[in-house]
């Protein structure tokens, strides 16, 4: 493990009331002696001048020193809390970097040090970035629960259960004359089914956490003048898009970030789909299809005042081009003009909603539908946040536990059961970082802020 001493600004770049520089590593006390002219007592606040190499005072503020291992990173840590002007922060940072053995921290390197020194596991370290980036109160509460170890504790309980079961199975393998009796006595199967049930519950909670963290990408598509931009404005609660009676008004992609009962949604309005001759409009339509192909759900907007035969043709042509794995919802807009009732129905396996973006009648049905389609459940207490890699690891663990159950109940193959349990344990342990590649660590921590 690197024993470098690193420094970075811990507060956001720019002007502020307070600016903080963080130093972590074996030379932290030496930095204090050279910049402050004083050896600091651990965990005691000192109000001191911060000096340049020639003794000129650069700033004055509070200095805090934490002796390893009793710090965030597990290393010696010095924090200098001064005035938040960026020039002042830059001068102080430049001064510290003049000291031999000090270098600028990489993005996320403080959190990486904390992980490598067993102050945080990997899921907790990721929760720091998630807490900073939280886009809603519920997401922030859930990220804090992950940081406090709620997600990690659930994973560790699963890992401990798998290890216990592996020990039992491998003990049976060591006594081949009695192996079948051990495997067939029902205890292993009972324990394995209990683990699978617990994992299913954690998977469901993790899915909710992933929705809270990443949101749902919803693309509004359809022919010109169907009311796509009006629906975007209604969902956004503001005039985000220009709305006119002129077909093709929207020529580029418009994005809005909204929340429905705490669930983040990325709503994307696109250019009307038609055979365009205008070059600018053609570019907009190509961009529309690019967004459609990356969506979590498509809202195909139809003008319910038009002839039904024409609408059926529009829908069939769109579905013929739509990638089959992308969920589709049909929205029959302008119900206030066509006289249709504002309802949510199902036709040929597709959700069909009649509404009026102009009067907003039926729009709440759409909001509820979007929540239900993602399996989102409102939780007033908040759960924990999860990432896509967590969901993938949980899914792989489930696959191998299920495979182990088959090897147990159908073939009584003790060695194969043990191997499936080992692989499941490995995938679960990847979440907290017990088994993690250096490449994965690099990808995770490089996405952090410099000072975290």
Curated annotation (Swiss-Prot):
GO BP: tRNA methylation; tRNA wobble uridine modification
Protein name per UniProt: tRNA modification GTPase MnmE
Domain TrmE-type G, first and last residues per copy: 215-375
Principal subcellular localisation of the protein: cytoplasm
Organism whose genome encodes this protein: Histophilus somni (strain 129Pt)
InterPro entries tied to this protein: G_TrmE, GTP-bd, GTP-bd_TrmE_N, GTPase_MnmE, MnmE_dom2, MnmE_helical, P-loop_NTPase, Small_GTP-bd
Cellular component terms (Gene Ontology): cytosol
Subcellular location, record wording: Cytoplasm
EC number of this enzyme: 3.6.-.-
Function: Exhibits a very high intrinsic GTPase hydrolysis rate. Involved in the addition of a carboxymethylaminomethyl (cmnm) group at the wobble position (U34) of certain tRNAs, forming tRNA-cmnm(5)s(2)U34.
Keyword entries, A-Z: Cytoplasm, GTP-binding, Hydrolase, Magnesium, Metal-binding, Nucleotide-binding, Potassium, tRNA processing
Binding site for Mg(2+): 229, 250
Chain positions recorded as K(+) binding sites: 225, 244, 246, 249
Amino acids binding GTP: 225-230, 244-250, 269-272, 333-336
PANTHER family per UniProt: TRNA MODIFICATION GTPASE GTPBP3 (PTHR42714), TRNA MODIFICATION GTPASE GTPBP3, MITOCHONDRIAL (PTHR42714:SF2)
CDD domains reported in the protein's UniProt record: trmE (cd04164), TrmE_N (cd14858)
